[in-house]
């Protein structure tokens, strides 16, 4: 009887956690939608007509495409032109794989082009969700505006970070994040994925559990962020949460 009294509450708790996690899990009727756009439209159109439609850019030589996301007036996605599912892909840790974070940062000009005026780098962020916090099975880096409240927090906390991974002193949107500064040269040489895999214990064995983000810092360095999936805390490591696709941080707000 005592065992039953212990087991039943524990089982009920697990059911509640599983139900809550399912509720927060991103769902998609077609998880291959992005890959279909790349492989059946953007790349073939670029090859046959020289126009990347519906993508904004196709660069097969450097292994990426850029697509305007339907969510938000300025959000763009940078994606591999080849099939790479996401954070869990071993290819991301290979030195010959394109430096997608570097490419995504270089593609931020699409936001300003769409907005019609320059956008300060402090308002821009990159984010890629974990294997468990995404709805699409093609790697895609969100290039979008930073949430105003997150911008304020990172402006305050970012200066305290060093060039090794450590826990961000203040949670972002209730979630714990790891953070570290990175120079443009290091980002260009190693890429964000290998910096995470080589710098956080055992991260290379469970890369799919992590979501990553990046913002710029005064002086030219970047701040890399990483969030790890935590079932008990209902955190699916969807780092896109730090972004605001409405771009309320801009004045005037785009429409």
Q: How does the language model describe each region?
A:
Residues 5-9, 17-255:
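HIT superfamily nucleotide-processing domains
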Residues 1-3:
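N-terminal Lys/Arg-rich, disordered targeting/topogenic segments
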């Amino acid at each position: 009887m005592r065992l039953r009294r212990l087991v039943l509450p524990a089982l009920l708790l697990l059911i509640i956690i599983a139900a809550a996690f399912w509720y927060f899990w991103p769902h998609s009727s077609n998880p291959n939608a992005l890959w279909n756009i790349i492989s059946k439209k953007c790349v073939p159109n670029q090859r046959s007509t020289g126009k990347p439609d519906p993508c904004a850019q196709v660069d097969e030589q450097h292994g990426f495409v850029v697509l305007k996301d339907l969510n938000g007036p300025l959000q763009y996605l940078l994606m591999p032109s080849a099939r790479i599912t996401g954070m869990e892909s071993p290819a991301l840790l290979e030195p010959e794989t394109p430096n997608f974070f570097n490419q995504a940062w270089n593609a931020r000009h699409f936001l300003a082009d769409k907005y019609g005026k320059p956008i300060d780098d402090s308002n821009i962020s990159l984010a890629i969700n974990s294997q468990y916090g995404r709805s699409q099975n093609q790697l895609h880096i969100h290039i979008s505006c930073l949430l105003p409240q997150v911008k304020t927090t990172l402006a305050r906390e970012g200066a305290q970070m060093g060039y090794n991974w450590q826990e961000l002193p203040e949670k972002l949107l209730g979630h714990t994040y790891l953070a570290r500064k990175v120079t443009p040269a290091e980002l260009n040489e190693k890429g964000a994925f290998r910096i995470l895999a080589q710098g956080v214990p055992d991260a290379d064995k469970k890369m799919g559990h992590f979501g990553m983000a990046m913002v710029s810092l005064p002086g030219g360095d970047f701040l890399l962020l990483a969030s790890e999936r935590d079932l008990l805390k209902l955190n699916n490591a969807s780092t896109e949460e730090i972004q605001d696709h409405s771009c309320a941080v801009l004045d005037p707000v785009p429409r």
